[in-house]
Amino acid sequence: MDLKTFGGRRNFVFRNWAGIYSSRPEWYFQPSSVDEVVEIVKAAKLKNKTIVTVGSGHSPSNMCVTDEWMMNLDKMNKLLDFVENEDKTYADVTIQGGTRLYKIHKILREKGYAMQSLGSISEQSIGGIISTGTHGSSPFHGLVSSTIVNLTVVNGKGEVLFLDEKSNPEVFRAATLSLGKIGIIVGATVRVVPAFNIKSTQEVIKFETLLEKWDSLWTSSEFIRIWWYPYTRKCILWRGVKTNEPQTKSRYSWWGSTLGRFFYQTLLFISTKIYPPLTPYVERFVFRRQYGEVETLGKGDVAIEDSVTGFNMDCLFSQFVDEWGCPMDNGLEVLRSLDHSIAQAAANKDFYVHVPVEVRCANTTLPKEQPETSFRSNTSRGPVYGNLLRPYLDNTPSQCSYAPIHSVTNSQLTLYINATIYRPFHTNAPIHKWFTLFEDTMSAAGGKPHWAKNFLGSTSFAQGQVKAEGQYQDYEMRGMATRVKEWYGSDLETFKKVRREQDPDNIFLANKQWALINGIIDENE
């Protein structure tokens, strides 16, 4: 079998966007059809090889690193179908699994539609954001997976499966957050809504103001996110609503300019590599340049942008990212604890954090039946669900109960906190002390990590071959296996069962060690 027939090539070097990890797979494939994907999977089985599928490489973790076979679906990026519902309050768009979000946005824009909620970037593939539990920030919207109507997947046996709520629901629940372990997503149908602009207000608030308004703040707007600057003791409160008002000029960004960006990265390099106690002063300087100093609650600056521009943001530089989700009701305790720990660490010159610490929310609760949609306009709040099945590996609190939009409180919400440490000019900065404290705090509050981020865990939580603590690099993942088993319980066992059924020869267990130390597979697999 000539593997070059399927776009295979050697000597390809994969690097993730952050530049933290790289690998040279034995073969790198870019198939252009489902049939080619099937043949590659069958060839891997024949030759006893594993396959990992990659898209944009935006996960900062090492979950996609392999020295065996790697597949990229960038050539599978076509629109397959577009169906509006009768009253045109939503539409179902079917695209190939390798389609990047920015191309989906272009397709939808031409048809007058948009995705319902997005994360911070649009470079990923649709298969990638489904597989990793991507989310935006809203008290009404949940994971992007909740907008998925159906999936077409090639499993480890080379079979092409159609999955939705009624057809193979168990496999569907596993595939809507699969970490690439169930199969290769070659097609997806996404429920989208009529296009809208986002009118956002951006306000400077004191950290104490955030705590004071905690109980009412998170449900005050359909889209909301907060950027916390601990050393400055201020936050940026961003709130957005859907609108048909005409678009305005986007906000000016000091660090979005060539000079500002270079200067900020240089300051980070100096504070990381030469004199860490400079870090709080760098934060205060950058905050003043970007936002000013005066609290602007109630009189922030306003911008009206298309939905994609409103959702997406500038993620600046290469970075380590550790994001966890916990019950919003525990959020005040978490923020106060982290604030105290960050201040104490700086006073003792123990460690320093980079900013912003991003604070977001989501509502992953699901109704028992599809809500009525005939009344909706393009500015109506809340989601139009593609399915009502919770993924087995959803890391958000499972105990929250659904409530209609007008009754949503913090008790329905997941609080996401994103701890970021930049890698100025692609040089590593220490993360272990800060991320370990952060993880302990979030875990104590009922939190769980985002699967695709740089969570560290502990040698006491891992399974399989574990090194002595001193043998790990500062940023190296130790593992979370025992915690994962506690957190996910029977859902994890069902996921494992589905995985074994769909991939009995472990074709998709590239980088098996990652799956093992985090409890996705058992030691005997």
UniProtKB/Swiss-Prot annotation:
GO MF assignments: D-arabinono-1,4-lactone oxidase activity; FAD binding; myosin V binding
Among the Pfam families in the record, one is: FAD_binding_4
Catalysed reactions, as listed in the record: D-arabinono-1,4-lactone + O2 = dehydro-D-arabinono-1,4-lactone + H2O2 + H(+)
Q: Which residues form a coiled coil?
A: none
Q: To which pathway does this protein belong? A: Cofactor biosynthesis; D-erythroascorbate biosynthesis; dehydro-D-arabinono-1,4-lactone from D-arabinose: step 2/2
Q: Which cofactor does it need?
A: FAD
Q: What is its EC number?
A: 1.1.3.37
What the record says about family reads: Belongs to the oxygen-dependent FAD-linked oxidoreductase family.
Cellular component, GO annotation: cytoplasmic side of mitochondrial outer membrane
Where does this polypeptide localize? Mitochondrion membrane
Output one GO BP term.
cellular response to oxidative stress
The alphabetized UniProt keywords are: FAD, Flavoprotein, Membrane, Mitochondrion, Oxidoreductase
The record ties this protein, via InterPro entries, to: ALO_C, FAD-bd_PCMH, FAD-bd_PCMH-like_sf, FAD-bd_PCMH_sub1, FAD-bd_PCMH_sub2, FAD_lactone_oxidase-like, Oxid_FAD_bind_N, Oxy_OxRdtase_FAD_BS
State the protein's name. D-arabinono-1,4-lactone oxidase
- Please give the chief subcellular localization of this protein: mitochondrion
List of residues that carry Pros-8alpha-FAD histidine: H58
In terms of domain of life, where is this protein from? Answer: Eukaryota
Domain FAD-binding PCMH-type per the UniProt entry, residue ranges: 20-195
